[in-house]
């Protein structure tokens, strides 16, 4: 499940003012199987002719074009394939609706760094860095398609390869989801009966992050597969569930802060967890440290008390601002569970209807 996108020699070295013209994600969507441009690229690969294609015709591009001939004709897969039989580059409009030039010699600055060895790929990489627009190189000898964009080199893979990898990743994700559900249910019971320990919390956070990571890998394959990924998208959505909201809720419950944690503090903790490598993620002490809890082996069995966000999150239609009001007033889940309808309705902004709804919901959960 190793991604095929690799950084170029200097990923931050893009021409001024061009960084936001095109993105890797947006370009991959336009190169997905079944799109006109991908159809043309597949024809070129089968014909063993090679190609150099620039997606964009702004001033940055035209300033490095030499020779060839200019015209302005509608894009067609067969037309692009025929034009790519010539030695030079083909220039497309940014929306890939028209072919603007053909048989062009590209003259990007030779000072742009490149890790490529072949002439076509060196020119493609330097042109992408110089202009900030996506450039595609099709290898005549290796039958590969490489996209250069946003300072990255991304080799396109065959749909069958992507499908196999995505299906394998879905199997892994299904195992992660099963294990997450187990530790999640165990934590939920511990929260309701006031015997939560640090390791209970850490175990859930670890598995939520593992689920998120494998989901991101599948997202990349889904993006490249385009319409061929519909079934995978359905399975991915089912396995992912509401993982993002659940991750926020558990951090809100257990992050050590003065008072209830601010959104910025929650997102900072999630960001810190996402930056842990796979090996570091498996060490409970690293998660405990991010939460502000003692990162020692002995402290993992220490009791901790949830604020109540995770449990309130299980009650339909209870919004975050109501949760904040209740938790500010009662302090933790145990106090919330012992509160009466009258106690809840006395909180500013809650009212009797919400108080009854929340009390009934807590009763069902416990």
Swiss-Prot record:
Record flagged with keyword Ribosomal protein: no
Enzyme class (EC, first level): transferase
Classification via Gene3D superfamilies: 5' to 3' exonuclease, C-terminal subdomain (1.10.150.20), DNA integrity scanning linker region (1.20.1260.110), DNA integrity scanning protein, DisA, N-terminal domain (3.40.1700.10)
Biological process annotations from GO: DNA repair
Cofactor(s) needed for function: Mg(2+)
GO molecular-function terms, A-Z: adenylate cyclase activity; ATP binding; diadenylate cyclase activity; DNA binding
Entry keywords, A to Z: ATP-binding, DNA damage, DNA repair, DNA-binding, Magnesium, Nucleotide-binding, Nucleotidyltransferase, Transferase
Family of this protein: Belongs to the DisA family.
PANTHER family with a match to the protein in the record: DIADENYLATE CYCLASE, DNA INTEGRITY SCANNING PROTEIN DISA
Described purpose of this protein according to its UniProt entry: Participates in a DNA-damage check-point. DisA forms globular foci that rapidly scan along the chromosomes searching for lesions.
Protein name as annotated: DNA integrity scanning protein DisA
Organism name: Corynebacterium glutamicum (strain R)
Name of the coding gene: disA
């Amino acid at each position: 499940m190793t991604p095929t996108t690799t950084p170029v020699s200097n990923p931050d070295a893009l021409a001024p003012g061009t960084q936001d013209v095109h993105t890797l994600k947006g370009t991959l969507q336009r190169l997905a199987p079944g799109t006109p441009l991908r159809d043309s690229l597949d024809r070129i690969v089968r014909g063993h002719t090679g190609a150099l294609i620039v997606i964009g015709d702004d001033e940055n591009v035209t300033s490095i074009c030499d020779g060839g001939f200019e015209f302005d004709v509608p894009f067609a897969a067969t037309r692009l394939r025929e034009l790519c039989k010539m030695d030079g580059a083909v220039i497309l409009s940014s929306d890939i609706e028209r072919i603007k030039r053909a048989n062009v010699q590209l003259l990007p600055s030779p000072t742009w760094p490149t890790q490529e060895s072949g002439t076509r790929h060196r020119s493609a990489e330097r042109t992408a860095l110089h202009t900030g627009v996506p450039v595609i190189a099709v290898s005549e000898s290796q039958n590969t398609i490489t996209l250069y964009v946003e300072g990255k080199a991304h080799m396109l893979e065959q749909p069958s390869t992507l499908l196999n990898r995505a299906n394998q990743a879905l199997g892994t994700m299904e195992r992660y989801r099963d294990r997450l559900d187990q530790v999640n249910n165990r934590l939920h019971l511990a929260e309701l009966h006031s015997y939560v320990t640090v390791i209970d919390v850490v175990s859930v956070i670890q598995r939520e992050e593992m689920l998120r990571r494998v989901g991101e890998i599948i997202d990349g394959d889904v993006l490249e597969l385009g319409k061929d990924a519909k079934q995978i998208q359905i399975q991915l959505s089912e396995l992912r569930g509401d993982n993002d909201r659940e991750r926020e809720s558990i951090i809100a419950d257990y992050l050590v802060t003065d008072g209830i944690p601010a959104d910025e503090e929650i997102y900072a903790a999630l960001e810190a967890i996402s930056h842990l490598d796979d090996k570091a993620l498996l060490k409970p002490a690293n998660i405990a440290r991010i939460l502000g809890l003692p990162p020692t082996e002995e402290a993992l069995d220490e009791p901790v008390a949830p604020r109540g966000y995770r449990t309130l999150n299980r009650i339909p239609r209870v919004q975050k601002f109501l949760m904040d009001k209740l938790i500010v007033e009662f302090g933790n889940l145990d106090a919330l569970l012992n509160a009466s309808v009258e106690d809840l309705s006395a909180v500013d902004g809650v009212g009797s209807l919400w108080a009854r709804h929340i009390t009934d919901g807590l009763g069902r959960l416990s």
